[in-house]
Amino acid sequence: MSEVRLPPLRALDDFVLGSARLAAPDPCDPQRWCHRVINNLLYYQTNYLLCFGIGLALAGYVRPLHTLLSALVVAVALGMLVWAAETRAAVRRCRRSHPAACLAAVLAVGLLVLWVVGGACTFLLSIAGPVLLILVHASLRLRNLKNKIENKIESIGLKRTPMGLLLEALGQEQEAGS
């Protein structure tokens, strides 16, 4: 197996301008639509990664505090979930011994989450927005000959890319090769 490499950035003309051919997928043939999306994800992965990074950076630039705080709240909430799951008996004892302190802690966390909701929305949109645009582009973009050749090289294992590995992990390697 060869080493994993990020493919080159595709020209803007190939990606969205001039020679880019766009067409709505046929909703009656979901398998073909899936093949188109997977093959475009493989071929334009560097362009998509750049678009995702720009979207995340833009959201971080526009509302940096909310983006950072929402990431912190998500991390803390997950940490609390893991902690409570591992130490359920201790949480139960604490709740019985100090009900007022537990109630105050729950209210404080709730208040923090409510205060950060704007940031959480910013964080979600900074991820969901670029991902949605990527999937729309991958659905609408028709494949060209160069795209098909690159995807065949990837499918027979001569060239490994991060998106190819991700698709394999998701069980889509047979889809990508067709």
From Swiss-Prot:
GO terms classed as biological process: protein transport
Residues annotated as transmembrane: 42-62, 65-85, 97-119, 123-140
Top-level division of the source organism's lineage: Eukaryota
Matching InterPro entries: Prenylated_rab_accept_PRA1
Protein topology in the membrane: Multi-pass membrane protein
Keyword Membrane: yes
Places the protein is found: Endosome membrane
Transcription regulation recorded as keyword: no
Extracellular side: 63-64, 120-122
GO cellular component assignments: endosome membrane
Keywords of the record: Endosome, Membrane, Protein transport, Transmembrane, Transmembrane helix, Transport
Chain ranges on the Cytoplasmic side, renumbered to this chain: 1-41, 86-96, 141-178
Its biological purpose: May be involved in ER/Golgi transport and vesicular traffic. Plays a proapoptotic role in cerulenin-induced neuroblastoma apoptosis.
Similarity annotation: Belongs to the PRA1 family.
Known partners and oligomeric status: Interacts with CCR5 and GDE1.
Protein name from the UniProt record: PRA1 family protein 2
Organism (species): Macaca fascicularis
Phylogenetic classification of the source organism: Eukaryota, Metazoa, Chordata, Craniata, Vertebrata
